[in-house]
Amino acid sequence: MKNISIYLLALVSSLACFNEVTAQQVPVRSNYLMTSFQDNVASAGNKPCLDMRMGFRNQWIGFEGAPSNSFASLSGRIFETNQSVHGVGGRIEIDEAGPWGTTSFSLAYAYKLKMTNGGWLSSGLSVGFVQHRLRISSLDFPDVQAAYDPAVSASKQLMFPTIDAGLWYEGEHSFIGISMINATASELSEMTLSTRTSRHIVATAGTSIDLERSFRFRPSAQMRMVSGLPISLDVTALVSYDNQISIGVGYRSQTALIAHLQLALMDYITVGYAYDFGISDIRLAAASSHEVTIALSACDKRSKRAQHCSAYD
């Protein structure tokens, strides 16, 4: 009975930690212009060639148990005509925050239809699974002996199906997309006393404005919505030169100022780096976050076939 009481206390403590990171059940990404497929399955096959993305985010440097995220994705086309495209892809993602962790894998399909104005409208769906982990051994126990009891210190793991859906529209210079992530909203009562994961709505939009001498201005925004929490908004302004280098700044609502740098290495690789300067109260313990994203594309960027919306990537 004593062990059960301590176990429940550990769960209550972990639930408090879980509530602190609820807003990040869907990871926040500063380089969202480079991770459209990760955030919206309808963008699978946007490029007419194999496209691989990898990324890592280390948040709140110096804060014990701070969130970290890594992902990899591969997408492409399986069939296309002048009026329609069938895109497919796969995604894997690992997210850690204190004693909590998730690993997700999904396969996606997107259908794209060319509109009369020359733009493309896409709808997409992904199906996969997500594994939730609770490492009880990493929690602090009031009873030292109980911490070494296998019945108390063992980790908990649960696996659930997950479904994402999205819509995406892009023209030559602008795009807009909206997606629902974690439509299944799994119940975690076996781990955390009647806690349910949340459905997330992610909306992203951007445009591109040509300037003089091969310069281009690319403003964009991403909004993340989840029931019971304030809306999170990122606003980004990038200036690109000759599709080779981009620098810019961003703002995340009441949370961070962001510095951006993107470099095209050769014609097939793009590397993006973002540095978040914390402006919320947590900056007193951890003021910064780092994020690196790598894009590997089989398309030669200077090929006409590779051209797509200039507002992202």
Give residue spans per PLM region:
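Subset of outer-membrane beta-barrel
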Residues: 24-313
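Bacterial N-terminal signal peptides
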Residues: 7-16
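Positively charged n-region of N-terminal signal peptides that target proteins for export
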Residues: 1-6, 115-117
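Sec/Tat signal peptide C-region and signal peptidase I cleavage site
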Residues: 18-23
